[in-house]
Amino acid sequence: MRDHSYAPRARGGRHAGHRARRAVLLFLLLAAMPACRAGIDHLVPYDDSGIWKRSNQEIVEYGVIAIAAGGALWEGGESRLGKTFWRSIDSGVAAGLVAQLMKVTFSRVRPRDSGPAPGDPNLWFQGHGNESFPSGEVTEVSSIVTPFVLEYGHDHPGVYALELLPIYDAIARVKVQAHWQTDVLAGFALGTGTAWLIHRSPNSPFILQVMPHGIYVGLKKSF
């Protein structure tokens, strides 16, 4: 039998919540519009060395995913920490799916494939294989760390340091000419906005609800 003794977080009024959701959805829509690039896109000198090296970017991306998945399975969903882990899984999956759909829809050419310097950031809807907008990795990292910032930031301000991970990834992706500046900004907005919506939902976490009892209570109770 599942223990539902975990106290739910305080939530605002229903109407205020609906207004906030609409505001976030509008923000995400604006972030997804090609017209919002506002002239900030430009090709930067290629840099795949030091902390910006591609292998280090992959360590951050896969490390964040592994910690979220491992923490969710280990902790289960009966504690505040466990529920936060599972919300990060929800937001990571949801934001990742939306990002992939947007990539295929907008089919934007990556900076490294857009021609000689300074490149052409205006190559949208170029068909299969062009998936620059938005940055999937920045979307993924921001969607996974944001639930922890939202849940614990007020009590433990140091948690805000987690935001350095998507910021690092955004800079690194631009430096290796894999994304334009608006690609990573849109990815950050998409990941953060998705996590916020899931955090605010009284029915989250969602994926946890279809998990078997052994996963719900956490693997730690099996040892």
Predicted feature descriptions by range:
Residues R2-R22, F27-G76, G82-W86, A99-N130:
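N-terminal transmembrane-helix/juxtamembrane module of multi-pass inner/ER membrane proteins
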Residues A7, G115-S222:
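Membrane-embedded catalytic cores of phosphoryl/pyrophosphoryl-handling enzymes
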Residues K53-V60, E78, Q177-A178, V210-I215:
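Solvent-exposed loop/turn segments connecting transmembrane beta-strands
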Residues I59-Y62, T84-R87, S91, P157-Y160, ...:
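Alpha-helical transmembrane segments of integral membrane proteins
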Residues Y62, A66-A69, V98, V141-I144, ...:
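Hydrophobic alpha-helical transmembrane segments of multipass integral membrane proteins
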Residues G63, G70-W74, V93, L97, ...:
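Sec/Tat-exported extracytoplasmic proteins
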Residues R80, S88-I89, K175:
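Membrane-interface alpha-helices
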Residues F85, I89-T105, S143-I144, L185, ...:
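Hydrophobic, lipid-facing residues on alpha-helical transmembrane segments of integral membrane proteins
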